């Protein structure tokens, strides 16, 4: 037997189109050389955002045994110690490629609001901060709405459809950090895990890569640049 995910969002196509419109606007904001064109009006900073909860801090119970030959295997004892978990809240600026992290022991409304405050401090006042994000309850909670109301006009949210997280480009980044850094990592504490994750972000931001969306872009061809 094979399983599938039933589409239970009656507005799936509409919401998907809204996300793709944003990606098309981003595409049109670059010239042929890949440079960002000047905005004619209010600048819109678009951030692809999501949370990655439950990142485990795991310690070895015995040292790894290093390979004895150039092509040998590293051996690791099958027992380990769980030291707790961290949640990664992260966004990618779709114009610059910069990755923006926040680590927390939870991923509640208060954590999401803290991330919004980081964005608010990062981008100049008067510019719009547009987030592509999923329908997590923290993104629509009373606490979050209260914060947004106190910063009217500063943030715009574009929600992915239910079961449509694959439309959010941050998911590709989460896959990358899992492959390159988190899979198999061993640490002595949660603090070390946090330090190493933040260091990963510092390293990749030295040469940021702009993510480009390709799927169905040929169907979104009549939009004007978001300038």
Question: Positions of the model-derived regions?
Answer:
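Charge-mixed, compositionally biased segments that are often intrinsically disordered regulatory tracts
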Residues: 1-82, 224-227
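Mobile genetic element proteins and their domesticated derivatives, centered on retroelements
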Residues: 48-50, 91, 97, 116, ...
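Short, solvent-exposed loop/turn segments at secondary-structure junctions
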Residues: 52-55, 61, 94-96, 136-138, ...
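Electropositive, glycine- and tryptophan-enriched low-complexity nucleic-acid-binding patches
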Residues: 57, 67-127
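RNase H-like polynucleotidyl transferase catalytic core
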Residues: 75-80, 149-169, 185-187
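Acidic, metal-coordinating catalytic cores used for nucleic-acid/nucleotide bond scission
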Residues: 107-108, 131-142, 162-167
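Active-site proximal helix-loop segment of RNase H-like, two-metal nucleases, encompassing DDE(D)
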Residues: 170-192, 205
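C-terminal domain-tail junction helix/linker
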Residues: 192-227
């Amino acid at each position: 037997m094979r399983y599938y995910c039933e589409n239970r969002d009656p507005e799936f196509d509409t919401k998907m189109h809204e996300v793709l419109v944003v990606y098309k606007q981003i595409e049109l904001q670059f010239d042929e050389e890949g440079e960002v064109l000047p905005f004619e009006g209010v600048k819109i900073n678009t951030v692809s955002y999501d949370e990655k909860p439950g990142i485990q801090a795991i310690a070895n119970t015995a040292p790894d045994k290093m390979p004895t030959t150039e092509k040998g295997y590293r051996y690791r004892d099958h027992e380990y110690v769980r030291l707790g978990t961290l949640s990664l809240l992260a966004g990618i600026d779709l114009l610059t490629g910069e990755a923006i992290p926040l680590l927390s022991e939870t991923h509640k409304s208060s954590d999401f609001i803290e991330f919004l405050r980081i964005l608010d401090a990062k981008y100049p006042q008067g510019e719009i901060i547009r987030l592509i994000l999923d329908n997590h309850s923290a993104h629509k909670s009373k606490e979050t709405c209260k914060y947004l109301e106190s910063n009217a006009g500063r943030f715009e949210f574009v929600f992915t459809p239910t079961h449509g997280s694959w439309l959010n480009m941050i998911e590709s980044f989460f896959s990358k950090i899992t492959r390159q850094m988190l899979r198999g990592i061993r640490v002595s504490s949660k603090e070390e895990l946090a330090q190493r994750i933040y260091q990963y972000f510092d390293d990749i931001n030295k040469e940021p890569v702009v993510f480009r969306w390709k799927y169905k872009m040929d169907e979104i061809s009549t939009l004007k640049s978001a300038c």
